């Protein structure tokens, strides 16, 4: 993603709205512990494109943030050297805690004032999945993070590790659920998810599933940004696309071609987070999130 903004005492003004390119940098890292050559090629192509944009919009400073998928790769230095050569800035690999804070800040920035807190931000990333609880449940969502946990269960790796058939078998799905639930239960020891009143999803998986639940025939960021979705609708669309063959998923323009191979694992991960948080909320205050 690239975004160019002017920051002043009056706030933030977007000069170049968000540009998104799906590169799947974490492709096969779980298996090989290295960035795949095709993933690096996609990353460098996006970086060169961004460099051209920055030539048209000279900036005072650039921050290139990379997440945990970068830290896991043995050829990380090669990636960082090439990005620095293209953009003139070295990627900054941030810890999961900072990734969680930034995700929560971005997620709560689009929440309506009438939406009840505390808020649980869920970021299904390429290298990890963050759970961040915050907001005081009274005023407009603030940026106060109460608890956060980074789970080493990225959506793409659930597909690569468990959902190997197309479509996946029921046994593979149950194996993936057991793996995901174990990580979520561990996260809940740090994050009191039962206090959650509103779940805010962040990531291409979440926005894609939401767009499909809304019945959009093509992906529209402006329509999805800040949209709400019931758990019932989320479960239905998650299960549908988890069990859908790849060739059929390709017919949906709502799904970016770069996500077609991994959207099933992402859908299952999102499904389990929603279910486990709803169960925790019911146990905590006798009311499920709907």
Features from the language model and the residues they span:
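A short acidic Gly-Thr/Ser loop motif
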Residues: 1, 122-128, 202-206
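Residue-level detector of high-confidence beta-strand sites
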Residues: 15-18, 148-150
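Helical "lid/coupling" subdomains associated with nucleotide-phosphate turnover
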Residues: 6-9, 24, 28-57, 69-118, ...
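Cationic, histidine-enriched alpha-helical/coil surfaces that engage anionic ligands
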Residues: 61
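A structural signal for short, well-ordered beta-strand segments
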Residues: 19-23
């Amino acid at each position: 993603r690239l975004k160019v903004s002017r920051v002043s005492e009056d706030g933030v003004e977007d000069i170049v709205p968000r540009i998104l390119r799906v590169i799947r940098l974490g492709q096969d890292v779980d298996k090989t512990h290295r960035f795949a050559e095709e993933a690096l090629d996609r990353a460098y192509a996006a970086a060169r494109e961004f460099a051209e944009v920055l030539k048209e919009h000279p900036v005072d400073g650039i921050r290139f943030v990379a997440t945990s998928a970068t830290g896991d790769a043995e050829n990380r230095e090669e990636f960082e050297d090439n990005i620095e050569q293209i953009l003139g800035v070295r990627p900054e690999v941030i810890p999961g805690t900072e990734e969680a804070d930034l995700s929560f800040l971005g997620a709560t920035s689009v929440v309506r004032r009438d939406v009840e807190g505390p808020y649980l931000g869920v970021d299904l990333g390429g290298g990890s999945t963050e759970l961040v609880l915050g907001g005081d449940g009274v005023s407009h969502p603030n940026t106060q993070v109460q608890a956060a946990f980074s789970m080493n269960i990225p959506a793409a790796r659930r597909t690569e590790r468990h959902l190997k058939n197309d479509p996946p078998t029921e046994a593979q799905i149950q194996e993936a659920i057991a793996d995901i639930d174990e990580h979520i239960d561990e996260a809940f020891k740090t994050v009191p998810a039962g206090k959650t009143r509103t779940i805010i999803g962040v990531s291409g998986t979440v926005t894609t599933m939401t767009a499909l639940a809304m019945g959009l025939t093509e992906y529209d960021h402006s329509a999805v940004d800040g949209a709400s979705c019931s758990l019932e609708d989320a479960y239905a669309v998650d299960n549908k696309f988890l069990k859908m063959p790849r060739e059929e998923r390709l017919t949906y323009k709502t799904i970016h071609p770069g996500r077609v191979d991994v959207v099933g694992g992402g859908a299952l991960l999102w499904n389990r987070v929603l279910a486990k948080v709803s169960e925790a909320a019911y146990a905590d205050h006798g009311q499920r999130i709907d």
